[in-house]
Amino acid sequence: MKIMFVAAEGAPFAKTGGLGDVIGALPKSLVKNGHEVFVILPYYDVVDQAFGHQVEDVLYFYTQVGWRRQYVGIKKLVKDKVTFYFIDNQAYFFRGRIYGDWDDGERFAYFQLAAIEAMEKIGVIPDILHVHDYHTAMIPFLLKEKYHWIQAYQAIRTVFTIHNIAFQGQFDPGMLGDLFGVGIGRYEDGTLRWHDCLNWMKAAVLYADRVTTVSPSYAHEIQTPAFGQGLDQVMRMEAGKLSGIVNGIDTDLFNPARDPHLPASFSAEDLSGKAATKQVLQERLGLPVRADVPLIGMVSRLTDQKGFQLVLEELSHILQQDVQLVLLGTGDPDYEAAFSWFAKAYPEKLSANITFDLPLAQQIYGACDLFLMPSAFEPCGLSQMMAMRYGAIPIVHEIGGLKDTVASYNAYEKTGTGFGFDQFSGFWLTQTLLFALDIYHNHKEDWQTIQQHAMTKDFSWDTASLAYLDLYKSLL
């Protein structure tokens, strides 16, 4: 099977979040199953700086972006047996950042047109074309409405994945003619119209052969007004082709037995290195070195989505317990200031690191006993899976991917990989934490069982990719 991914970002070339992780890992796993896999990405300046000496110039052509005749350079790099093609146009992609420019609509309209036309130029016509988030959401529409006359494209089956429904790509409908070079008819008949805007994500949901989200629970949630961000009606209408597949994590990269960032390695069979890692982290962050105190980690963007309003609401109560908290992340300035204030008020209990530091993040996963992730909504979430891999037991709000990946501890059956609360409130966050602390202090055998279950749960992409393969095969 020939499978092609088109996305706005992908590790290790350009990455801002979970989408980049998926594009970096899923194709590798599909190749292991014997399939030909190709990825099309924009050639950003960050890609040029890090990989410019490795890429190969393949060809160039010009495409029409409405009335504009734009250069399209095609560059190529084979990595981990996956063939990456890059769309090169410095005017659009050498901006110093991936997203956030005033003309993002034009930039990604160009990218989608160039990617579609590039397939024929490079001679790669996939069986499955898998596009991701709003930046590539018009591709299924364009294949069926603008490029349907190209015979080679008629057998392509399309899959669209929603990583976060909050970002839908809503633009002025004049863009259809001005950038995509198609008529206004599909907007006027309501197909592409949503709240008096051209909605790229709606186009993908209607025109793609299959629609997926990054967890089964999120696939259900986005069909409700509470989580559908205005598209819940469309999601319910197309529910027959909607499904959820949980993301995986790179288990080679996130492996406490071989992680170069940890001062001591450990595994589910031998946890002695975890105690040593905890001691080193306490020393590094200026916390009292105590093996017996529960160390609670938080590695996240500091935003409302991640539930930090609950943490701040309850923090003075939590810090009355015999615990230590370690925070790593940046985000809302109000949250940054609040956690910095608490760290100064409770220097022996809270270390607030308002930055992003990957080695420190790995050490927090490796050192902590508990990991706090009370997200208000979470399409999938990766941090909770990384934490479990390192024996840091997650405390989560049972929503979206958190509900699908963390099995709440059952004291009677002695099962579970973490602790969860159903109602999004500070009270239940604190009650769940107190329950977890009771197990940690007073039921050591049960705690070790939870750790064993968490560390040995299979979150590998090799397993997650099988669900995608089943989906692809169902289309052929």
Curated annotation (Swiss-Prot):
Top-level taxon in the UniProt lineage: Bacteria
SUPFAM superfamilies associated with the record: UDP-Glycosyltransferase/glycogen phosphorylase
InterPro entries named among the record's database cross-references: Glyco_trans_1, GS/SS, Starch_synth_cat_dom
Reaction catalysis annotation: [(1->4)-alpha-D-glucosyl](n) + ADP-alpha-D-glucose = [(1->4)-alpha-D-glucosyl](n+1) + ADP + H(+)
EC numbers for this chain: 2.4.1.21
Binding site for ADP-alpha-D-glucose: 15
Pfam families: Glyco_transf_5 (PF08323), Glycos_transf_1 (PF00534)
UniProt keyword terms in alphabetical order: Glycogen biosynthesis, Glycosyltransferase, Transferase
Pathway(s) the chain acts in: Glycan biosynthesis; glycogen biosynthesis
Molecular function GO terms recorded: alpha-1,4-glucan glucosyltransferase (ADP-glucose donor) activity; alpha-1,4-glucan glucosyltransferase (UDP-glucose donor) activity
Keyword Acetylation (UniProt): no
One GO BP annotation of this record: glycogen biosynthetic process
Broad EC category: transferase
Family listed: Belongs to the glycosyltransferase 1 family. Bacterial/plant glycogen synthase subfamily.
Protein purpose: Synthesizes alpha-1,4-glucan chains using ADP-glucose.
Entry-linked PANTHER family: ALPHA AMYLASE DOMAIN-CONTAINING PROTEIN, GRANULE-BOUND STARCH SYNTHASE 1, CHLOROPLASTIC/AMYLOPLASTIC
Protein name listed in UniProt: Glycogen synthase
UniProt organism field: Streptococcus equi subsp. zooepidemicus (strain H70)
